[in-house]
């Protein structure tokens, strides 16, 4: 019966899903020259239409109409997001084909951990309605709200987890060990976790391999953007990142950081906003050697997308990105915010610095974030601008805690100035 239900679900994935699934399969056998030919045709079409200048977040804020095609009611919709770097923005996306395309690529990545379409997932990231746990029947996913995992709810969470059949755990890299800490390592080892699906923050060097060896659980991991311009999977063979050539076009340009290149992306979507030579503000480590998996464009690592965690009022480390942004991109909330930054200088306390847009409802902003951070005292400060780091990159999190601020965290965490956004709300 389960197989029948899965077959029905896969049957409604849509024509774009099956088109891209076939394209992905074929592209893995392409030579480097075949990949260049496929990409150059589409990339040059964008250059002829929009020019060859490097674009920034602000270009799409100020001139969205210029970069948007076929903005037809019902066929397209407005996407509001915290943005790849935490700077809120909005753009237009295809209402149907985009989501089908996303599923094709993400399901391909998730298959590295053994996932098949509509296998059971437990998703520990983002905001959810209705308290601690919510089931999405269409996606076959149990969603656990990070904001509801306060100390008094942990007993219920642990009891519920013991009742589950085998499942895939869907997390941010920074929330994986938080989840283990919340449920307890002994219980986690007994849970029927088939694999881990880790969204597009970066694991600190060696962490992914260490987890897989320690727990005997495979991780599917990727690098992507909420702007849907480029997408790369983490290769289990070389541990680098391979960019899907049929998803979008990636350029690696020189930077001021030795051994690193700027990541520039261009999207291949036909409807909605087209991102052209878009500066992701991420850096990539130059590839070394070769990988026999495929001839996709490849980098050794992504720089500037490391985990960021805050310490709550119980001394636990939690993923800041999952709590701060999560699924807030589903409505007009981000239209009120131009920029924001979190600062922590003592456990259990967060300062939120907000650059509001004209007409912003400040009380709504404060209440929205207070609801997401019940395990910390939140102070909101409205400012005219967020300063950048000496290197010129904006920082959405400033961690001023001493390294020994918490004893309950049994896994080392890094504090870096940048974070990633997961591709889509699947």
Residue ranges and their predicted role:
Residues 169, 271-272, 276-374:
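AMP-binding/adenylate-forming catalytic core of the ANL superfamily
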Residues 256-257, 314, 391:
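Residue-level recognition of short loop/turn positions
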Residues 203-290, 306-307:
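Conserved AMP-binding/adenylate-forming
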Residues 1-80, 86-119, 127, 163, ...:
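Nucleotide 5′-phosphate-binding alpha/beta core
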Residues 120-122, 264:
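Conserved beta-strand elements of the Class I
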Residues 50, 81, 121, 169, ...:
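Residue-level signal for inorganic ion chemistry
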Residues 126-244:
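Conserved adenylate-forming
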């Amino acid at each position: 019966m389960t197989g029948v239900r899965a077959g029905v679900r896969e049957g409604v994935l849509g024509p774009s899903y099956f088109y891209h699934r076939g394209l992905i399969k074929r592209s893995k056998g392409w030579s480097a020259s075949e990949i260049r030919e496929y990409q150059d045709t589409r990339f040059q079409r964008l250059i002829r239409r929009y020019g060859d200048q490097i674009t920034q977040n602000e270009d799409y804020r100020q001139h969205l109409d210029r970069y948007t095609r076929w903005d037809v009611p019902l066929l397209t919709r407005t996407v509001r997001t915290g943005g790849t770097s935490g700077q809120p923005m909005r753009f237009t996306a295809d209402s149907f084909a985009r989501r089908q395309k996303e599923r094709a690529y993400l399901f391909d990545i998730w298959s590295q951990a053994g996932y098949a379409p509509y296998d059971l997932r437990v998703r520990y990231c983002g905001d959810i309605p209705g308290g601690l746990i919510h089931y999405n029947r269409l996606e076959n996913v149990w969603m656990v709200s990070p904001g509801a995992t306060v100390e008094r709810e942990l007993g219920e969470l642990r009891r519920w987890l013991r009742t589950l059949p085998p499942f895939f755990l869907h997390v941010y890299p920074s929330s994986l060990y938080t989840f283990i800490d919340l449920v307890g390592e002994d219980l986690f080892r007994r849970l029927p976790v088939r694999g881990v699906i880790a969204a597009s923050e970066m694991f600190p060097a060696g962490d992914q391999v260490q987890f897989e060896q320690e727990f005997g659980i495979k991780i599917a991991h990727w690098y992507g953007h909420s702007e849907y311009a480029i997408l790369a999977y983490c290769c289990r063979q070389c541990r680098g990142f391979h960019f899907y050539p049929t998803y979008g076009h990636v350029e690696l340009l020189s930077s001021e950081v030795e051994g690193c290149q700027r990541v520039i992306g261009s999207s291949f979507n036909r409807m909605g906003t087209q991102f052209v030579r878009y500066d992701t503000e991420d850096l990539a480590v130059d590839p070394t050697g070769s990988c026999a998996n495929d001839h996709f464009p490849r980098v050794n690592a992504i720089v500037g997308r490391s985990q960021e965690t805050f310490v709550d009022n119980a001394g636990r480390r939690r993923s800041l990105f999952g709590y701060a942004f999560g699924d807030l991109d589903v409505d007009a909330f981000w239209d009120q915010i131009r920029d924001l930054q979190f600062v922590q200088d003592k456990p259990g306390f967060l300062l939120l610095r907000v650059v509001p847009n004209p007409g912003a409802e400040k009380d709504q902003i404060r209440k929205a974030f207070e609801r997401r951070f019940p395990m910390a005292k939140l102070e909101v400060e409205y400012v005219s601008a967020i300063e950048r780091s000496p290197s010129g990159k904006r920082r959405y999190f400033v961690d001023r805690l001493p390294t020994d601020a918490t004893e309950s965290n049994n896994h080392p965490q890094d504090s870096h100035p940048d974070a990633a956004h997961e591709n889509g709300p699947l």
